Protein backbone atom coordinates (compact mmCIF):
# COMPACT_ATOMS: atom_id res chain seq x y z
CA UNK A 1 0.00 0.00 0.00
CA UNK A 2 0.95 3.66 -0.18
CA UNK A 3 3.16 5.50 2.28
CA UNK A 4 0.32 7.43 3.96
CA UNK A 5 -2.60 6.13 6.00
CA UNK A 6 -4.90 6.88 3.10
CA UNK A 7 -5.78 4.22 0.57
CA UNK A 8 -5.86 5.54 -3.01
CA UNK A 9 -7.97 3.69 -5.54
CA UNK A 10 -8.40 4.16 -9.28
CA UNK A 11 -11.77 3.18 -10.71
CA UNK A 12 -12.58 2.21 -14.29
CA UNK A 13 -16.17 2.54 -15.51
CA UNK A 14 -17.25 1.13 -18.86
CA UNK A 15 -20.55 -0.74 -18.77
CA UNK A 16 -22.22 0.81 -21.82
CA UNK A 17 -21.34 3.92 -23.83
CA UNK A 18 -19.62 6.04 -21.16
CA UNK A 19 -15.92 5.65 -20.34
CA UNK A 20 -14.96 6.92 -16.91
CA UNK A 21 -11.83 7.00 -14.80
CA UNK A 22 -11.79 8.24 -11.23
CA UNK A 23 -9.30 8.37 -8.39
CA UNK A 24 -10.48 8.64 -4.80
CA UNK A 25 -8.97 8.28 -1.34
CA UNK A 26 -10.28 6.24 1.56
CA UNK A 27 -11.26 9.55 3.17
CA UNK A 28 -13.61 10.21 0.28
CA UNK A 29 -11.53 12.89 -1.45
CA UNK A 30 -11.96 12.76 -5.22
CA UNK A 31 -8.57 13.42 -6.84
CA UNK A 32 -9.68 12.85 -10.43
CA UNK A 33 -12.98 12.11 -12.13
CA UNK A 34 -13.67 12.35 -15.84
CA UNK A 35 -16.20 10.66 -18.10
CA UNK A 36 -16.22 10.65 -21.90
CA UNK A 37 -19.41 9.61 -23.67
CA UNK A 38 -19.50 7.72 -26.94
CA UNK A 39 -21.92 9.45 -29.29
CA UNK A 40 -22.83 7.24 -32.27
CA UNK A 41 -22.89 8.81 -35.74
CA UNK A 42 -26.05 6.83 -36.45
CA UNK A 43 -28.68 6.67 -33.72
CA UNK A 44 -28.41 3.83 -31.24
CA UNK A 45 -25.44 2.29 -29.45
CA UNK A 46 -23.55 -0.45 -31.26
CA UNK A 47 -21.89 -2.62 -28.56
CA UNK A 48 -18.71 -3.22 -30.55
CA UNK A 49 -18.29 0.47 -31.38
CA UNK A 50 -18.84 1.34 -27.72
CA UNK A 51 -16.14 -1.18 -26.77
CA UNK A 52 -13.72 0.37 -29.28
CA UNK A 53 -14.48 3.76 -27.73
CA UNK A 54 -13.52 2.39 -24.30
CA UNK A 55 -10.26 0.93 -25.59
CA UNK A 56 -9.22 4.28 -27.06
CA UNK A 57 -10.50 6.47 -24.25
CA UNK A 58 -9.11 4.54 -21.27
CA UNK A 59 -5.58 5.12 -22.60
CA UNK A 60 -6.21 8.87 -22.91
CA UNK A 61 -7.80 9.15 -19.48
CA UNK A 62 -5.04 7.17 -17.77
CA UNK A 63 -2.51 9.55 -19.30
CA UNK A 64 -4.51 12.45 -17.85
CA UNK A 65 -4.57 10.77 -14.44
CA UNK A 66 -0.78 10.43 -14.44
CA UNK A 67 -0.56 14.20 -14.81
CA UNK A 68 -2.52 14.63 -11.57
CA UNK A 69 -1.17 11.77 -9.48
CA UNK A 70 1.68 9.38 -10.33
CA UNK A 71 0.24 5.96 -11.06
CA UNK A 72 2.74 4.35 -8.69
CA UNK A 73 0.88 6.12 -5.86
CA UNK A 74 -2.22 4.05 -6.63
CA UNK A 75 -2.89 1.36 -4.00
CA UNK A 76 -5.88 -0.41 -5.53
CA UNK A 77 -7.48 -0.91 -8.95
CA UNK A 78 -11.27 -1.22 -9.17
CA UNK A 79 -13.37 -1.83 -12.28
CA UNK A 80 -17.04 -2.23 -13.16
CA UNK A 81 -17.57 -5.99 -13.38
CA UNK A 82 -21.22 -5.71 -14.38
CA UNK A 83 -24.02 -5.38 -15.20
CA UNK A 84 -23.67 -4.06 -18.70
CA UNK A 85 -22.91 -4.75 -22.34
CA UNK A 86 -20.59 -7.71 -22.80
CA UNK A 87 -18.06 -6.08 -25.18
CA UNK A 88 -17.83 -2.94 -23.03
CA UNK A 89 -17.35 -4.93 -19.84
CA UNK A 90 -14.61 -7.06 -21.39
CA UNK A 91 -12.57 -4.03 -22.46
CA UNK A 92 -13.00 -2.46 -19.02
CA UNK A 93 -11.96 -5.65 -17.21
CA UNK A 94 -8.96 -6.16 -19.50
CA UNK A 95 -7.81 -2.59 -18.86
CA UNK A 96 -8.19 -3.10 -15.13
CA UNK A 97 -6.22 -6.34 -15.14
CA UNK A 98 -3.41 -4.86 -17.23
CA UNK A 99 -3.20 -1.83 -14.94
CA UNK A 100 -3.20 -3.91 -11.75
CA UNK A 101 -0.54 -6.28 -13.07
CA UNK A 102 1.69 -3.48 -14.32
CA UNK A 103 1.42 -1.59 -11.02
CA UNK A 104 1.61 -4.81 -8.97
CA UNK A 105 -1.49 -3.72 -7.05
CA UNK A 106 -4.62 -5.62 -5.95
CA UNK A 107 -7.72 -5.55 -8.13
CA UNK A 108 -11.43 -5.65 -7.29
CA UNK A 109 -14.41 -5.94 -9.63
CA UNK A 110 -17.50 -4.15 -8.33
CA UNK A 111 -21.21 -3.93 -9.06
CA UNK A 112 -22.07 -0.89 -11.15
CA UNK A 113 -25.50 -0.39 -9.55
CA UNK A 114 -24.27 -0.57 -5.95
CA UNK A 115 -21.54 1.91 -6.91
CA UNK A 116 -24.21 4.48 -7.78
CA UNK A 117 -25.78 4.08 -4.35
CA UNK A 118 -22.52 4.36 -2.43
CA UNK A 119 -21.18 7.42 -4.27
CA UNK A 120 -24.57 9.03 -3.69
CA UNK A 121 -24.30 8.41 0.04
CA UNK A 122 -20.71 9.70 0.07
CA UNK A 123 -21.63 12.91 -1.71
CA UNK A 124 -24.81 13.67 0.25
CA UNK A 125 -25.88 13.40 3.89
CA UNK A 126 -27.92 10.26 3.21
CA UNK A 127 -27.24 7.40 5.62
CA UNK A 128 -30.02 4.85 5.14
CA UNK A 129 -31.97 5.96 2.08
CA UNK A 130 -34.61 4.35 -0.02
CA UNK A 131 -32.90 4.77 -3.38
CA UNK A 132 -34.46 5.37 -6.78
CA UNK A 133 -31.83 4.34 -9.34
CA UNK A 134 -32.68 5.48 -12.86
CA UNK A 135 -30.45 5.22 -15.91
CA UNK A 136 -30.35 4.09 -19.51
CA UNK A 137 -30.17 0.44 -18.53
CA UNK A 138 -31.68 0.30 -15.05
CA UNK A 139 -34.78 1.37 -13.16
CA UNK A 140 -34.81 0.09 -9.58
CA UNK A 141 -36.08 1.04 -6.14
CA UNK A 142 -33.51 -0.18 -3.61
CA UNK A 143 -33.37 -0.45 0.17
CA UNK A 144 -30.63 -1.75 2.44
CA UNK A 145 -31.81 -4.59 4.62
CA UNK A 146 -30.20 -7.81 5.75
CA UNK A 147 -26.72 -6.96 4.41
CA UNK A 148 -27.92 -6.43 0.85
CA UNK A 149 -29.44 -3.70 -1.25
CA UNK A 150 -32.81 -5.31 -1.97
CA UNK A 151 -34.64 -4.60 -5.21
CA UNK A 152 -38.09 -3.62 -3.94
CA UNK A 153 -39.38 -2.37 -7.25
CA UNK A 154 -38.12 -2.28 -10.82
CA UNK A 155 -39.11 -2.05 -14.45
CA UNK A 156 -40.85 -5.08 -15.88
CA UNK A 157 -39.58 -4.30 -19.38
CA UNK A 158 -37.37 -1.38 -20.42
CA UNK A 159 -35.54 1.15 -18.26
CA UNK A 160 -36.62 4.79 -18.09
CA UNK A 161 -33.46 6.04 -19.81
CA UNK A 162 -33.94 3.51 -22.60
CA UNK A 163 -37.56 4.63 -22.96
CA UNK A 164 -36.56 8.28 -23.36
CA UNK A 165 -33.69 7.46 -25.72
CA UNK A 166 -35.86 5.23 -27.92
CA UNK A 167 -38.48 7.94 -28.20
CA UNK A 168 -35.83 10.52 -29.04
CA UNK A 169 -34.39 8.28 -31.77
CA UNK A 170 -37.88 7.80 -33.19
CA UNK A 171 -38.17 11.58 -33.44
CA UNK A 172 -34.67 11.88 -34.99
CA UNK A 173 -33.18 13.55 -31.92
CA UNK A 174 -29.52 13.04 -31.03
CA UNK A 175 -28.08 10.70 -28.39
CA UNK A 176 -28.46 10.82 -25.41
CA UNK A 177 -32.11 11.49 -26.08
CA UNK A 178 -33.26 12.17 -22.54
CA UNK A 179 -31.56 15.57 -22.56
CA UNK A 180 -33.50 16.65 -25.66
CA UNK A 181 -36.78 15.24 -24.34
CA UNK A 182 -36.28 17.34 -21.20
CA UNK A 183 -35.62 20.48 -23.26
CA UNK A 184 -38.71 20.02 -25.42
CA UNK A 185 -40.83 19.12 -22.38
CA UNK A 186 -40.12 22.53 -20.84
CA UNK A 187 -41.94 24.11 -23.80
CA UNK A 188 -44.93 21.75 -23.69
CA UNK A 189 -48.32 23.13 -22.63
CA UNK A 190 -50.89 20.48 -23.54
CA UNK A 191 -51.08 17.28 -21.46
CA UNK A 192 -51.85 14.22 -23.58
CA UNK A 193 -53.34 11.14 -21.97
CA UNK A 194 -50.85 8.24 -22.08
CA UNK A 195 -50.72 4.75 -20.47
CA UNK A 196 -49.88 4.85 -16.77
CA UNK A 197 -48.69 1.40 -15.68
CA UNK A 198 -47.86 0.76 -12.03
CA UNK A 199 -48.05 -2.73 -10.53
CA UNK A 200 -47.39 -2.49 -6.83
CA UNK A 201 -43.82 -1.22 -6.65
CA UNK A 202 -43.00 -2.36 -10.19
CA UNK A 203 -43.41 -0.34 -13.34
CA UNK A 204 -43.70 -0.74 -17.11
CA UNK A 205 -42.67 1.71 -19.82
CA UNK A 206 -43.17 -0.21 -23.08
CA UNK A 207 -46.84 0.75 -23.50
CA UNK A 208 -46.05 4.37 -22.65
CA UNK A 209 -43.28 4.44 -25.25
CA UNK A 210 -45.47 3.00 -28.01
CA UNK A 211 -48.33 5.39 -27.23
CA UNK A 212 -45.95 8.38 -27.23
CA UNK A 213 -44.67 7.39 -30.66
CA UNK A 214 -48.25 7.21 -31.93
CA UNK A 215 -48.99 10.67 -30.53
CA UNK A 216 -45.94 12.00 -32.37
CA UNK A 217 -47.12 10.32 -35.59
CA UNK A 218 -50.56 11.90 -35.18
CA UNK A 219 -48.97 15.35 -35.61
CA UNK A 220 -49.17 16.38 -31.98
CA UNK A 221 -46.50 18.97 -31.21
CA UNK A 222 -43.24 17.33 -30.16
CA UNK A 223 -43.10 19.71 -27.19
CA UNK A 224 -46.47 18.45 -25.94
CA UNK A 225 -45.58 14.80 -26.51
CA UNK A 226 -42.27 15.17 -24.65
CA UNK A 227 -44.03 17.04 -21.85
CA UNK A 228 -46.70 14.35 -21.52
CA UNK A 229 -44.22 11.48 -21.78
CA UNK A 230 -41.99 12.98 -19.12
CA UNK A 231 -44.84 13.90 -16.76
CA UNK A 232 -46.38 10.43 -17.02
CA UNK A 233 -43.13 8.48 -16.72
CA UNK A 234 -41.79 10.53 -13.83
CA UNK A 235 -45.12 10.43 -11.99
CA UNK A 236 -44.97 6.65 -12.23
CA UNK A 237 -41.40 6.64 -10.87
CA UNK A 238 -42.32 8.96 -8.02
CA UNK A 239 -45.36 6.86 -7.17
CA UNK A 240 -43.51 3.54 -6.93
CA UNK A 241 -40.88 5.26 -4.78
CA UNK A 242 -43.63 6.55 -2.51
CA UNK A 243 -45.18 3.09 -2.36
CA UNK A 244 -41.83 1.60 -1.35
CA UNK A 245 -41.45 4.34 1.25
CA UNK A 246 -44.84 3.48 2.72
CA UNK A 247 -43.89 -0.19 2.90
CA UNK A 248 -40.37 0.20 4.34
CA UNK A 249 -40.84 3.43 6.34
CA UNK A 250 -37.31 4.54 5.48
CA UNK A 251 -36.53 8.07 6.75
CA UNK A 252 -34.94 9.41 3.57
CA UNK A 253 -34.98 9.07 -0.22
CA UNK A 254 -32.03 9.36 -2.58
CA UNK A 255 -32.05 9.71 -6.37
CA UNK A 256 -29.09 8.36 -8.38
CA UNK A 257 -28.24 7.37 -11.95
CA UNK A 258 -27.95 9.26 -15.21
CA UNK A 259 -31.63 10.23 -15.35
CA UNK A 260 -31.20 11.82 -11.90
CA UNK A 261 -29.80 14.84 -13.74
CA UNK A 262 -33.34 15.66 -14.95
CA UNK A 263 -34.62 18.73 -13.10
CA UNK A 264 -38.30 17.79 -13.37
CA UNK A 265 -37.74 14.35 -11.84
CA UNK A 266 -35.81 15.90 -8.97
CA UNK A 267 -38.60 18.42 -8.45
CA UNK A 268 -41.28 15.70 -8.35
CA UNK A 269 -39.40 13.60 -5.81
CA UNK A 270 -38.65 16.60 -3.61
CA UNK A 271 -42.34 17.54 -3.55
CA UNK A 272 -43.29 13.97 -2.62
CA UNK A 273 -40.67 13.86 0.14
CA UNK A 274 -41.97 17.13 1.59
CA UNK A 275 -45.51 15.71 1.56
CA UNK A 276 -44.29 12.56 3.33
CA UNK A 277 -42.00 14.48 5.71
CA UNK A 278 -38.82 12.61 4.78
CA UNK A 279 -35.45 13.92 3.63
CA UNK A 280 -34.49 13.98 -0.04
CA UNK A 281 -30.98 13.71 -1.46
CA UNK A 282 -29.43 13.75 -4.91
CA UNK A 283 -25.67 13.97 -5.59
CA UNK A 284 -24.19 16.66 -7.81
CA UNK A 285 -24.47 16.05 -11.53
CA UNK A 286 -20.98 14.61 -12.12
CA UNK A 287 -21.77 11.79 -9.68
CA UNK A 288 -25.26 11.05 -11.03
CA UNK A 289 -24.26 9.52 -14.34
CA UNK A 290 -21.73 6.73 -14.85
CA UNK A 291 -18.31 7.74 -13.54
CA UNK A 292 -15.03 6.23 -12.40
CA UNK A 293 -15.09 7.78 -8.93
CA UNK A 294 -18.09 5.67 -7.91
CA UNK A 295 -16.28 2.50 -9.03
CA UNK A 296 -13.18 3.51 -7.08
CA UNK A 297 -15.19 4.33 -3.95
CA UNK A 298 -17.00 0.98 -3.87
CA UNK A 299 -13.66 -0.72 -4.46
CA UNK A 300 -12.30 0.99 -1.35
CA UNK A 301 -15.36 0.10 0.74
CA UNK A 302 -15.11 -3.55 -0.22
CA UNK A 303 -11.34 -3.74 0.17
CA UNK A 304 -11.13 -2.20 3.64
CA UNK A 305 -13.94 -4.53 4.72
CA UNK A 306 -12.10 -7.68 3.71
CA UNK A 307 -12.88 -8.20 0.02
CA UNK A 308 -10.02 -9.74 -1.96
CA UNK A 309 -10.02 -10.90 -5.56
CA UNK A 310 -7.56 -12.99 -7.51
CA UNK A 311 -6.92 -11.91 -11.08
CA UNK A 312 -8.57 -15.18 -12.15
CA UNK A 313 -11.79 -14.11 -10.41
CA UNK A 314 -12.22 -10.94 -12.44
CA UNK A 315 -14.47 -12.41 -15.11
CA UNK A 316 -17.19 -10.00 -16.20
CA UNK A 317 -20.79 -10.52 -15.05
CA UNK A 318 -23.17 -8.97 -17.63
CA UNK A 319 -26.23 -9.91 -15.54
CA UNK A 320 -24.82 -8.78 -12.17
CA UNK A 321 -27.91 -7.85 -10.13
CA UNK A 322 -27.79 -5.34 -7.30
CA UNK A 323 -29.10 -7.86 -4.78
CA UNK A 324 -26.32 -10.35 -5.58
CA UNK A 325 -23.77 -8.25 -3.65
CA UNK A 326 -23.06 -8.96 0.03
CA UNK A 327 -22.93 -5.57 1.75
CA UNK A 328 -20.87 -5.70 4.94
CA UNK A 329 -19.76 -2.09 5.20
CA UNK A 330 -22.98 -0.15 5.93
CA UNK A 331 -23.13 -0.50 9.73
CA UNK A 332 -20.02 -0.47 11.84
CA UNK A 333 -21.68 -0.78 15.25
CA UNK A 334 -21.47 2.86 16.39
CA UNK A 335 -24.52 3.93 18.34
CA UNK A 336 -25.14 6.87 16.02
CA UNK A 337 -25.23 4.69 12.90
CA UNK A 338 -27.49 2.15 14.58
CA UNK A 339 -29.85 4.94 15.59
CA UNK A 340 -29.98 6.11 11.98
CA UNK A 341 -30.75 2.64 10.68
CA UNK A 342 -33.54 2.28 13.24
CA UNK A 343 -35.07 5.66 12.32
CA UNK A 344 -38.41 5.42 10.54
CA UNK A 345 -40.77 7.68 8.63
CA UNK A 346 -43.15 9.38 11.07
CA UNK A 347 -46.92 9.33 10.48
CA UNK A 348 -48.93 12.40 11.61
CA UNK A 349 -50.56 11.79 15.00
CA UNK A 350 -54.13 12.47 13.87
CA UNK A 351 -53.90 9.61 11.36
CA UNK A 352 -53.81 5.86 12.00
CA UNK A 353 -52.07 5.33 8.70
CA UNK A 354 -50.53 7.18 5.77
CA UNK A 355 -49.96 5.20 2.63
CA UNK A 356 -48.53 6.15 -0.71
CA UNK A 357 -51.94 7.30 -1.94
CA UNK A 358 -54.14 8.05 1.02
CA UNK A 359 -54.51 9.33 4.56
CA UNK A 360 -56.34 6.96 6.92
CA UNK A 361 -58.47 8.50 9.68
CA UNK A 362 -60.34 6.53 12.35
CA UNK A 363 -63.89 7.54 13.29
CA UNK A 364 -67.48 6.34 13.61
CA UNK A 365 -70.20 5.79 11.04
CA UNK A 366 -73.51 5.75 12.89
CA UNK A 367 -72.95 3.13 15.62
CA UNK A 368 -70.00 1.38 13.92
CA UNK A 369 -66.29 1.99 14.22
CA UNK A 370 -64.97 3.08 10.85
CA UNK A 371 -62.01 4.36 8.92
CA UNK A 372 -62.08 6.98 6.20
CA UNK A 373 -59.56 6.59 3.42
CA UNK A 374 -58.94 9.83 1.53
CA UNK A 375 -56.86 9.84 -1.63
CA UNK A 376 -55.12 13.16 -1.24
CA UNK A 377 -53.92 15.40 -4.04
CA UNK A 378 -50.35 14.77 -5.14
CA UNK A 379 -48.44 17.97 -5.68
CA UNK A 380 -45.90 16.30 -7.93
CA UNK A 381 -48.47 15.28 -10.57
CA UNK A 382 -50.14 17.54 -13.13
CA UNK A 383 -53.69 18.42 -12.12
CA UNK A 384 -55.25 16.48 -15.02
CA UNK A 385 -53.30 13.31 -14.32
CA UNK A 386 -53.80 13.52 -10.57
CA UNK A 387 -57.58 13.95 -10.85
CA UNK A 388 -57.86 11.03 -13.26
CA UNK A 389 -55.78 8.66 -11.12
CA UNK A 390 -57.46 9.49 -7.80
CA UNK A 391 -60.97 9.22 -9.23
CA UNK A 392 -60.29 5.98 -11.08
CA UNK A 393 -58.66 4.30 -8.10
CA UNK A 394 -61.36 5.38 -5.64
CA UNK A 395 -64.00 3.82 -7.89
CA UNK A 396 -61.92 0.68 -8.43
CA UNK A 397 -61.28 0.15 -4.75
CA UNK A 398 -64.94 0.49 -3.82
CA UNK A 399 -65.95 -1.91 -6.59
CA UNK A 400 -63.42 -4.63 -5.82
CA UNK A 401 -63.82 -4.46 -2.03
CA UNK A 402 -67.45 -5.40 -2.62
CA UNK A 403 -67.01 -7.93 -5.44
CA UNK A 404 -64.18 -9.84 -3.79
CA UNK A 405 -66.59 -11.12 -1.13
CA UNK A 406 -68.35 -13.16 -3.83
CA UNK A 407 -65.25 -15.38 -3.92
CA UNK A 408 -65.08 -15.94 -0.14
CA UNK A 409 -62.33 -13.36 0.33
CA UNK A 410 -62.82 -11.23 3.45
CA UNK A 411 -62.69 -7.45 3.02
CA UNK A 412 -64.04 -4.45 4.96
CA UNK A 413 -67.69 -3.48 4.40
CA UNK A 414 -68.14 -0.11 2.73
CA UNK A 415 -70.36 2.47 4.46
CA UNK A 416 -70.03 5.48 2.17
CA UNK A 417 -68.29 6.62 -1.03
CA UNK A 418 -67.53 10.26 -1.82
CA UNK A 419 -66.19 10.28 -5.38
CA UNK A 420 -65.87 14.07 -5.55
CA UNK A 421 -63.53 14.18 -2.55
CA UNK A 422 -61.96 10.76 -3.27
CA UNK A 423 -63.04 9.30 0.09
CA UNK A 424 -64.23 5.84 1.10
CA UNK A 425 -65.61 5.22 4.59
CA UNK A 426 -65.50 1.57 5.55
CA UNK A 427 -65.64 -0.88 8.43
CA UNK A 428 -62.78 -0.70 10.92
CA UNK A 429 -61.18 -4.15 11.21
CA UNK A 430 -59.73 -4.93 14.62
CA UNK A 431 -56.50 -6.76 13.99
CA UNK A 432 -52.90 -6.41 12.94
CA UNK A 433 -51.24 -5.95 9.60
CA UNK A 434 -49.64 -9.13 8.31
CA UNK A 435 -46.39 -7.15 8.19
CA UNK A 436 -46.50 -6.57 11.95
CA UNK A 437 -47.40 -10.18 12.75
CA UNK A 438 -44.44 -11.41 10.74
CA UNK A 439 -42.14 -8.98 12.55
CA UNK A 440 -43.39 -10.51 15.82
CA UNK A 441 -42.48 -13.97 14.49
CA UNK A 442 -46.09 -15.10 13.95
CA UNK A 443 -46.28 -16.87 10.58
CA UNK A 444 -49.46 -18.80 11.38
CA UNK A 445 -51.64 -16.99 8.84
CA UNK A 446 -49.27 -17.10 5.86
CA UNK A 447 -50.89 -20.23 4.45
CA UNK A 448 -54.32 -18.57 4.72
CA UNK A 449 -52.97 -15.58 2.81
CA UNK A 450 -51.98 -17.89 -0.03
CA UNK A 451 -55.49 -19.36 -0.02
CA UNK A 452 -57.07 -15.89 -0.22
CA UNK A 453 -54.91 -14.99 -3.21
CA UNK A 454 -55.82 -18.28 -4.87
CA UNK A 455 -59.54 -17.59 -4.41
CA UNK A 456 -59.13 -14.09 -5.78
CA UNK A 457 -57.28 -15.32 -8.86
CA UNK A 458 -59.91 -18.00 -9.45
CA UNK A 459 -62.39 -15.13 -9.54
CA UNK A 460 -60.29 -13.52 -12.31
CA UNK A 461 -59.34 -10.57 -10.12
CA UNK A 462 -55.80 -9.17 -9.95
CA UNK A 463 -54.87 -7.07 -6.93
CA UNK A 464 -51.73 -5.47 -8.43
CA UNK A 465 -50.43 -4.29 -5.05
CA UNK A 466 -50.01 -7.39 -2.90
CA UNK A 467 -47.75 -6.56 0.04
CA UNK A 468 -47.70 -7.64 3.66
CA UNK A 469 -49.13 -4.18 4.42
CA UNK A 470 -52.35 -5.00 2.55
CA UNK A 471 -53.61 -7.86 4.71
CA UNK A 472 -55.24 -7.42 8.13
CA UNK A 473 -55.44 -10.42 10.45
CA UNK A 474 -57.58 -11.10 13.52
CA UNK A 475 -59.30 -14.50 13.76
CA UNK A 476 -59.55 -14.31 9.95
CA UNK A 477 -57.47 -12.68 7.22
CA UNK A 478 -58.78 -9.66 5.29
CA UNK A 479 -57.53 -8.23 2.01
CA UNK A 480 -57.48 -4.45 1.56
CA UNK A 481 -56.37 -1.68 -0.82
CA UNK A 482 -57.70 -2.58 -4.27
CA UNK A 483 -56.98 0.77 -5.94
CA UNK A 484 -54.81 -0.89 -8.61
CA UNK A 485 -57.11 -3.89 -9.04
CA UNK A 486 -58.35 -5.18 -12.38
CA UNK A 487 -60.11 -8.11 -14.01
CA UNK A 488 -57.84 -10.60 -15.76
CA UNK A 489 -57.56 -14.34 -16.21
CA UNK A 490 -54.09 -14.11 -17.77
CA UNK A 491 -51.49 -16.38 -16.19
CA UNK A 492 -48.90 -13.62 -16.57
CA UNK A 493 -50.97 -11.12 -14.57
CA UNK A 494 -51.43 -13.65 -11.77
CA UNK A 495 -47.71 -14.39 -11.78
CA UNK A 496 -46.85 -10.69 -11.56
CA UNK A 497 -49.31 -10.33 -8.66
CA UNK A 498 -47.33 -12.95 -6.74
CA UNK A 499 -43.98 -11.48 -7.76
CA UNK A 500 -45.01 -8.12 -6.29
CA UNK A 501 -45.80 -9.91 -3.01
CA UNK A 502 -42.56 -11.87 -3.16
CA UNK A 503 -40.49 -8.68 -3.47
CA UNK A 504 -42.36 -7.00 -0.65
CA UNK A 505 -41.62 -9.95 1.64
CA UNK A 506 -37.96 -9.99 0.68
CA UNK A 507 -37.62 -6.24 1.24
CA UNK A 508 -38.41 -6.25 4.97
CA UNK A 509 -38.84 -9.90 6.01
CA UNK A 510 -35.70 -11.28 4.33
CA UNK A 511 -34.64 -13.36 7.34
CA UNK A 512 -37.94 -15.29 7.28
CA UNK A 513 -38.51 -15.19 3.54
CA UNK A 514 -38.17 -18.91 2.78
CA UNK A 515 -40.62 -20.01 5.46
CA UNK A 516 -43.14 -17.26 4.65
CA UNK A 517 -43.07 -17.87 0.91
CA UNK A 518 -43.34 -21.64 1.27
CA UNK A 519 -46.46 -21.27 3.44
CA UNK A 520 -48.07 -18.80 1.04
CA UNK A 521 -47.39 -21.07 -1.93
CA UNK A 522 -48.73 -24.06 0.01
CA UNK A 523 -52.03 -22.23 0.45
CA UNK A 524 -52.07 -20.92 -3.11
CA UNK A 525 -51.39 -24.39 -4.54
CA UNK A 526 -54.86 -25.58 -3.54
CA UNK A 527 -56.27 -23.90 -6.61
CA UNK A 528 -56.37 -25.40 -10.10
CA UNK A 529 -54.45 -22.72 -11.95
CA UNK A 530 -51.63 -22.56 -9.42
CA UNK A 531 -49.11 -24.84 -11.14
CA UNK A 532 -49.12 -22.79 -14.36
CA UNK A 533 -48.88 -19.52 -12.43
CA UNK A 534 -45.96 -20.70 -10.31
CA UNK A 535 -44.11 -21.90 -13.41
CA UNK A 536 -44.69 -18.57 -15.11
CA UNK A 537 -43.22 -16.64 -12.19
CA UNK A 538 -39.79 -17.90 -13.26
CA UNK A 539 -40.40 -16.72 -16.83
CA UNK A 540 -41.41 -13.24 -15.71
CA UNK A 541 -38.48 -12.93 -13.31
CA UNK A 542 -36.06 -13.69 -16.13
CA UNK A 543 -37.14 -10.43 -17.76
CA UNK A 544 -35.79 -8.47 -14.81
CA UNK A 545 -32.96 -6.26 -16.01
CA UNK A 546 -29.70 -8.14 -15.33
CA UNK A 547 -31.31 -11.09 -13.52
Curated annotation (Swiss-Prot):
GO biological process: tRNA threonylcarbamoyladenosine modification
Top-level division of the source organism's lineage: Archaea
UniProt subcellular location: Cytoplasm
Keyword tRNA processing: yes
InterPro entries with a match to the protein in the record: ATPase_NBD, Bud32, Gcp-like_dom, KAE1/TsaD, Kae1_archaea_euk, Kinase-like_dom_sf, Peptidase_M22_CS, Prot_kinase_dom
Protein EC: 2.3.1.234, 2.7.11.1
Substrates-to-products reaction catalysed: L-seryl-[protein] + ATP = O-phospho-L-seryl-[protein] + ADP + H(+); L-threonyl-[protein] + ATP = O-phospho-L-threonyl-[protein] + ADP + H(+); L-threonylcarbamoyladenylate + adenosine(37) in tRNA = N(6)-L-threonylcarbamoyladenosine(37) in tRNA + AMP + H(+)
Residues binding Fe cation, per UniProt: 112, 116, 133, 290
CC cofactor note: Binds 1 Fe(2+) ion per subunit.
Region (Kae1): 1-329
GO (cellular component) term, any one: cytoplasm
Entry binding sites for L-threonylcarbamoyladenylate: 133-137, 165, 178, 182, 262
Short name of one Pfam family: RIO1
Domain Protein kinase: 346-547
Assembly, per entry: Component of the KEOPS complex that consists of Kae1, Bud32, Cgi121 and Pcc1; the whole complex dimerizes.
Main function: Required for the formation of a threonylcarbamoyl group on adenosine at position 37 (t(6)A37) in tRNAs that read codons beginning with adenine. Is a component of the KEOPS complex that is probably involved in the transfer of the threonylcarbamoyl moiety of threonylcarbamoyl-AMP (TC-AMP) to the N6 group of A37. The Kae1 domain likely plays a direct catalytic role in this reaction. The Bud32 domain probably displays kinase activity that regulates Kae1 function.
Protein name: Probable bifunctional tRNA threonylcarbamoyladenosine biosynthesis protein
Organism: Methanococcus vannielii (strain ATCC 35089 / DSM 1224 / JCM 13029 / OCM 148 / SB)
Amino acid sequence: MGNSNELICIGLEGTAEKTGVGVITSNGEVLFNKTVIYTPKIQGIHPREAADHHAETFIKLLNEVSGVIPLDKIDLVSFSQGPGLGPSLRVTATTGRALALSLKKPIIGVNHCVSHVEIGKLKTDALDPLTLYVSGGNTQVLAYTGKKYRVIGETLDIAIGNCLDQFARYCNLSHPGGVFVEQYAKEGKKFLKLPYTVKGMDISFSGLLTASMKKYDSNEKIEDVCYSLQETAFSMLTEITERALSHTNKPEIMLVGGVAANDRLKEMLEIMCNEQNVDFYVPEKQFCGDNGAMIAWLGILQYINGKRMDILDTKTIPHFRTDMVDVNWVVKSTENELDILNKKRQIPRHLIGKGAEADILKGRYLEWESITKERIKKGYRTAELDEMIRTRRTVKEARFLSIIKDFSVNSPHIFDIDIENKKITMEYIHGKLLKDLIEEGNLEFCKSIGELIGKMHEGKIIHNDLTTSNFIVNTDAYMIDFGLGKYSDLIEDKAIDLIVLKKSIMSIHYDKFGEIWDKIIEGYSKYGHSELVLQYIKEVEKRGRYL
